[in-house]
């Protein structure tokens, strides 16, 4: 009889908690101390297998397996007797009661096999045969028991080499294959494959299946029959037993894929043929039921665990891909979730084995798949797996994508939009691999990407290369824009910090790109897309000479390395812009040459006059010029330059930055603000825009788009439309005249002339109306550019306060920035400016280049005037006032500073309609005054203490 503790453990075996079941099973076996307890437990466990209570069957089966594994004295015959006794349905049982007994017997037989009790010396061939017979009988009870019963037999076959009567055991199982009911079933195929793995010294006869010729089901000539069996066709077709459809695929599929991995059978059908006949044509055929296709998706998931880069292409067959795309395209499809599991598996496999990414991608995007795979299927499968490829795979992907760019199918070659979309998609996909966090950046493929963009963006395509159709200007411009986007990413701090290989992260990639361009230019086979006149060539050569000197200094680890790196980057990017045909960049190059000369050339410094702009003024103008362009790459370049030279900024260069803040946010005042851009005023005067048009401006996104978007041909198309309408009017008039004219009449009478004039006037009115709309649109875009420009300039100021908190020149930014916050109509500028003050003011010390007290006082007065105009400036104005008061605290100007507050306070009280001060400015002033009072009290106390101490000591001495 069991103890109380053991009885409690039996109860815990029924728990739905797996951890509790496992723990209870182990404790129960450990607690058995005598034969009586062992006998009781064995009887209780075999009997409990038929229980339908919670998870009793699972818990009791685990405990029984553990008991049989640990205890060597238990005989298989005894356990089998108990199993049959307690788990045989008696009477006229139906439904769940009947199923409980079937499952109880199945779980018990599993415990016998998994415990290995049949490998003990005490076990006999009769025990082995009895287990096989019971499993075979049980498999015939219900169709849904067949597969799992045979799976237990498969596991039993694996133990045959360890059994003392192995040859007889082999014969007992091999005999099952001689019955058509087994041999022409999925279970029989699985059993055959298991038996072929038994060592030759154990086999007493050949493994053979009835009604198969040749005997091996995976022989090429048997594939059609195998296909019928594997999709479980009617028994009349296969000659075997008919199995009802089950949700899970048969276990045999695992053994089939393992057989193709082992390749021990010389007559094995090629995997390509097997997949095509059995899976693609058998299970994924257009006439297959949804149930079969559901199986097919499971088979695909399983196959991905076994295929290699050599044969993975075979499983991406035509019918499978059609079915996958079809069911992924709509969430309401019956097999949508099954298809989604396949995509998840593909992504998982790609992570585990990067060498598979390229062969997967080439089939998803190929003829059987679709270039639009992600868009058609509403997934991001291609986008997610491409960056996971290894180095060789990514290089292959680039060549694949480049082939899509260079060669378009005949059916779309004449469709300009389709061609441009295809080419843009391919180049964007290349770029997305670089930008993805999933890709491991390696120099060979990063260089390859840049070289592709340079070769086709800056040079004519060699005649030896076949491009169908020929590249348009838009396509070539697209390559240049993608190059700039790639360089923008490679120059970003996020990329550099993510690289453990500092050689890759610290590399000046724009310089690398420029070097490759110059190498290509040297070859007579390559022709630049743009031609430069002698004057431009002279400027370029001069800049290249300076760049060469800069690079030599960097290689020698010379002084001012950070500034030299900044100049190397600046030269490289601007030269790339010049080679792209940007005429404005030529002037920038000359400014950079001048600036470099003033910064690093001692002779130039000596010869410069006071009237000439300083190096920092020139550099600041260059930075502002670059910053005015909507390019994320140039913005990052300016940030790097500004950080490198911020300590060298002088008052004049700071005023240049402040001038941008002071500029009005209107179209007519923006002339000259943007390099190389003509600003048109609206035909109806200056266009007013709501501040809502500028809320939530994401400058990074806009700039990134500017690096990505292709050149629009809108102006050209508008002109073509106008010419077309004019031609139509004139042609109609001419035709009418020809119909009506006689030899004595004029070519066109007055009535016809008036009619023609009216039609022409109508065409021009339409054109003028469209032109006015276009001008209004341009005006809006210009205003948006002004706002974006100011946002970027505010970021420069924030950068300066961050990197130069001790430099008093930062004082120069206070009033211009505060005035801009007050005057702007755009919320984004107001919030951006206030954020700078909120985040940086408390950290400013201004111990160097400290502003004069007189200037500080004037600034304080100005701040209070501005704060009185707008209550929302209260917090910001108070913070600035506090900073300025601290600078005046120990100067004779403190009294006048306090009087500024007094004057503002009186205005706030006496003229509430005119003064809009926020009360916080006065609260903060009182708190500051209290702190100053406490400070002076402490100073006075400290000063008087030594005198008192000295007086007492003198008295003590006199005494």
Swiss-Prot record:
Chain's role: Plays an important role in the regulation of rRNA transcription. Binds to rDNA promoter fragments.
SUPFAM superfamilies in UniProt: ARM repeat
UniProt subunit comment: Interacts with cdc10.
Protein's name according to its UniProt entry: rDNA transcriptional regulator pol5
Organism superkingdom: Eukaryota
Pfam families in alphabetical order: DNA_pol_phi (PF04931)
Modified residues (Phosphoserine): 742-743
GO MF terms, alphabetically ordered: nucleotide binding; rDNA binding; RNA polymerase I transcription regulatory region sequence-specific DNA binding
Region (Disordered): 936-959
Compartments where found: Nucleus
GO cellular component, one term: nucleolus
Bridged cysteine pairs (disulfide): none
Keywords annotated in UniProt: Nucleus, Phosphoprotein
Biased composition (Polar residues): 937-948
Stretches with biased composition (Basic and acidic residues): 950-959
Assigned protein family: Belongs to the MYBBP1A family.
GO biological process, one term: rRNA processing
